[in-house]
Amino acid sequence: MSLAADNVLLVEEGRPATAEHPSAGPVYRCKYAKDGLLDLPTDIDSPWQFFSEAVKKYPNEQMLGQRVTTDSKVGPYTWITYKEAHDAAIRIGSAIRSRGVDPGHCCGIYGANCPEWIIAMEACMSQGITYVPLYDSLGVNAVEFIINHAEVSLVFVQEKTVSSILSCQKGCSSNLKTIVSFGEVSSTQKEEAKNQCVSLFSWNEFSLMGNLDEANLPRKRKTDICTIMYTSGTTGEPKGVILNNAAISVQVLSIDKMLEVTDRSCDTSDVFFSYLPLAHCYDQVMEIYFLSRGSSVGYWRGDIRYLMDDVQALKPTVFCGVPRVYDKLYAGIMQKISASGLIRKKLFDFAYNYKLGNMRKGFSQEEASPRLDRLMFDKIKEALGGRAHMLLSGAAPLPRHVEEFLRIIPASNLSQGYGLTESCGGSFTTLAGVFSMVGTVGVPMPTVEARLVSVPEMGYDAFSADVPRGEICLRGNSMFSGYHKRQDLTDQVLIDGWFHTGDIGEWQEDGSMKIIDRKKNIFKLSQGEYVAVENLENTYSRCPLIAQIWVYGNSFESFLVGVVVPDRKAIEDWAKLNYQSPNDFESLCQNLKAQKYFLDELNSTAKQYQLKGFEMLKAIHLEPNPFDIERDLITPTFKLKRPQLLQHYKGIVDQLYSEAKRSMA
């Protein structure tokens, strides 16, 4: 299959298999890198320059905003300017140096998204200090591991996390010497810190220890380590991904380039809503980009219950989400439309299908149905504050029906991407005006080249004349330098200059990439059938009755079972219709008739999407508690942690197999 030359360019022919290596397909890059991969200009050496230049251009523009709660009442967004944030970063950076942290040393940042997080990051950048984000959800053991592994001597922490960091001080006392709270600290905490031989400061105290002298800021180099980002992963200890100044800086330029060609470059009129974890590469690089353009960044309160309330208060122009959030947005809007009456529902369906048809013919978002946008869809856009002109999605593939909906309804451009911490965030992105890319993650970003490598054991052939499939491999200017202190792990994934992602992709004729599988998320049933479990979960998730699902099988069993978190309203509606006593949610999940109903509906969905017989579920457990980070069942980007899920539900899984075998006997 030849790929569309108007979207991607062939860089290098493929290579056949050898005794040591499987075959590898051709190398491609996107059309916006036709003269070579995007690289840094000679006058840019670090991300700090983006911020310092923005301060000169936009000193009085609103930069960082948050809502303050007083007497249980939340207020409007309050802002600090670029100049105020810059001065704070210079003072904090100076104070860090006064504690003996020198350029090249590591400084930790541990807490939820807030202005202080970004100021601490910029403070480190100003001094050439490597900042190490600590996930609020990693847990004390992982935090202790990272502090010791990265040799962090100073850490910034959220006010409510001070006690947590003090509790692990005993295990990292040889490294950690200074703790700085984003807010206040109590006298009791000060005393506890003193007893553990660590200095503890409030944000204001620490700021006063620094000065505003910019004359002696150290020189930065492109090859200096900017950050070490520890990925939570789904197994084992966290891995420290090394990203240097050049990788992050060129990724910022890459984002600007792709926004320019798919929508528009951002400017001082733009407002970005920050709620995805700042410790994760995706949101962090996006914020660095917006702050390079003089835009504003507003932070959520950190409570999922009030997420949409914060969106309404901020009215962002760019919304960066993950499939889980967009799924809920889609379900909420569709529920309101269904409840609006038959006539309104039919009018909506007509308008939706008319615009969908025009966009499939090649009309742009703006051209497809301007009158229907004003009459039908502009009101729906209010769900995201009414001003969003760009929606971005990452972390996992969007379900096709949700992606189509988001491209049509909010009258905003939607770009879905794919990337990893190792690729400094996005490595592929869809082109907003190319509707054929729905269901894919788009073309390579202008900083990277991509190829597929065959995976014979899974039946994926990167040389297939029909549809090339294989493991996605990347190389380029925004890639990581390796794993901190783990050359063994680096050598496993960096082979001949190519980073092996572990994700299985499929080239499309328009030059876009479709994620179809995960190399590690495949297992064989006892009769020899291979099961691509992530694909199955994505299919079963199309069933409107469920909120989350984990499918399990192994090579000793001939069939699959699952743990399902049901949609609460769906199971309560079923109870009313079937004269079952509603009781409480937990009791309904234990109801045998409810379990049978949900299993039948899931397998009906499986048949609808033509799953094979061995891919059908034979038994399920209805779980009232969502899979969450607190129990270590999902990652901060909502990916299932399969070993931990099996450990948590081992007894239930064994019971499901026993009961299913008895019923089949």
Curated annotation (Swiss-Prot):
One of the GO biological process terms: defense response to fungus
Its biological purpose is as follows: Activation of long-chain fatty acids for both synthesis of cellular lipids, and degradation via beta-oxidation. Acts in the cutin pathway. Preferentially uses palmitate, palmitoleate, oleate and linoleate. Required for repression of lateral root formation through its role in cutin biosynthesis and subsequent aerial tissues permeability.
| Recorded metabolic or biological pathway in which this protein acts | Lipid metabolism; fatty acid metabolism
Quote the protein name from its UniProt record: Long chain acyl-CoA synthetase 2
User: Gene encoding this polypeptide?
Assistant: LACS2
Cell division recorded as keyword: no
What family is it from?
Belongs to the ATP-dependent AMP-binding enzyme family.
Q: Show the CDD domains listed in the entry.
A: LC-FACS_euk (cd05927)
List GO terms (cellular component aspect): endoplasmic reticulum; plasmodesma
Q: What induces it?
A: Positively regulated by WIN1.
Swiss-Prot/TrEMBL catalytic activity: a long-chain fatty acid + ATP + CoA = a long-chain fatty acyl-CoA + AMP + diphosphate
